[in-house]
Design a protein with these regions (language model features):
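Low-complexity, acidic Ser/Thr/Pro/Gly-rich terminal tails and inter-domain linkers that flank the onset
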Residues: 204-224
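Short, aromatic- and glycine-rich surface loops/edge beta-strands on solvent-exposed regions
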Residues: 119-130, 178-195, 233, 282
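Low-complexity "stalk/linker" and mucin-like segments enriched in Ser/Thr/Pro/Ala/Gly
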Residues: 103-112, 256-275
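Extended substrate-binding grooves/exosites of carbohydrate-active enzymes
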Residues: 1-171, 195
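Short, solvent-exposed loop/linker segments at the N-terminal edge
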Residues: 63-69, 219-229
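Short, well-ordered beta-strand segments
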Residues: 30, 90-94, 247-257, 263
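Beta-strand-rich structural segments
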Residues: 74-78, 227-244, 282
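Edge beta-strands of extracellular beta-sandwich domains
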Residues: 94, 196-211
Length: 282
């Protein structure tokens, strides 16, 4: 209507609720953080509107997470001047433009994971690379049977003009779109500010997980009553990324003049959980 002064998102964190809401366990899970204030991916959109360096990829880039192995458009949340995308160490593209220009630092869309690779890796000319890239991306998006007629005709023209066989196209598709077999694909996002890399995210298949625990305070001080601290726990891979499918049990054990507030054993949800500790008033 043009009369809105602003808006805010609901809500900051997950919370316990009553019998009429929740997800079967009376927890509302629509926070941008979980109940222990571990940030979910959505929190990166809000954090990126500030000035402290932020970089988060909206996907783990795992083809097994998507129908037909097609990752599709991925959104990157950052407040950098630009974000560079690398595949196995080779520069794919540089992200700068966004359709949401009204935001101070809008999300950046990755809808082309081939970029300049056909030129730098296959040494194709610019026109040939652009034509092939368009055809390969269309095949990935629609599937060969579902490709629009104009894309099929473009593919045929490309084969005739550059004397390519169908098997040549299949090989390029497997290498640059399908990413099946062969060595594991390593994706890297580098956020640059004033020409310097300020944040970097590396995504690759991983089975080496570890726990990260962060306390909301380093010192507890009793006054008229006990003091309390929140302990946030995340399950991370070797590159510091949350393992979102790690629904693993986490056991807490306390020694000394502290009491555990909550269950001794909990289960990580989305690779995250937490607990609270309080002083014993001794």
């Amino acid at each position: 209507s043009g009369e809105h002064a602003g808006c805010f998102g609901w809500c900051m964190f997950d919370y316990a609720t009553h019998k009429d809401f929740g997800s079967g366990d009376r927890i509302c899970y629509h926070g941008v953080m979980d109940g222990f204030r571990n940030p979910k991916l959505a929190a990166a959109l809000y954090a990126s509107q500030g000035e402290q360096p932020v970089l988060a990829a909206g996907s783990g880039m795992d083809i097994g997470d998507y129908p037909a192995g097609q990752v599709g458009t991925v959104y990157v949340f950052s407040n950098a001047d630009s974000v560079e995308l690398y595949k196995n160490g080779a520069l794919v593209t540089t992200l700068r433009q966004s359709p949401w220009a009204s935001l101070p630092h809008p999300p950046l869309a990755v809808d082309d994971t081939i970029g300049q690779l056909l030129e730098t890796q296959e040494h194709f000319g610019r026109r040939k690379a652009a034509m092939l890239r368009d055809c390969l991306l269309a095949a990935g998006k629609y599937g060969l049977p579902g490709m629009p007629l104009r894309k099929k005709l473009k593919m045929l023209l490309c084969m005739l003009r550059y004397k390519m066989s169908f098997s040549d196209g299949v090989a390029l598709y497997g290498k640059y779109v399908g990413n099946w077999g062969g060595e594991a694909t390593v994706w890297r996002f580098d956020a640059k500010k004033d020409g310097k890399v300020v944040s970097s995210v590396t995504l690759k298949p991983s089975a080496r997980l570890h726990l990260e625990a962060h306390a909301s305070a380093e010192t507890l001080q009793e006054g008229d009553t006990y003091d309390m601290v929140a302990v946030r726990v995340r399950i991370l891979d070797e590159n510091g990324n949350v393992a979102p499918y790690a629904q693993l049990p986490v056991h807490f054990c306390v020694q000394g003049c502290l009491h555990l507030v909550g269950a001794e054993t909990t289960v990580a949800e989305g690779g995250m959980c937490g607990t609270y500790l309080r002083t014993a008033m001794q």
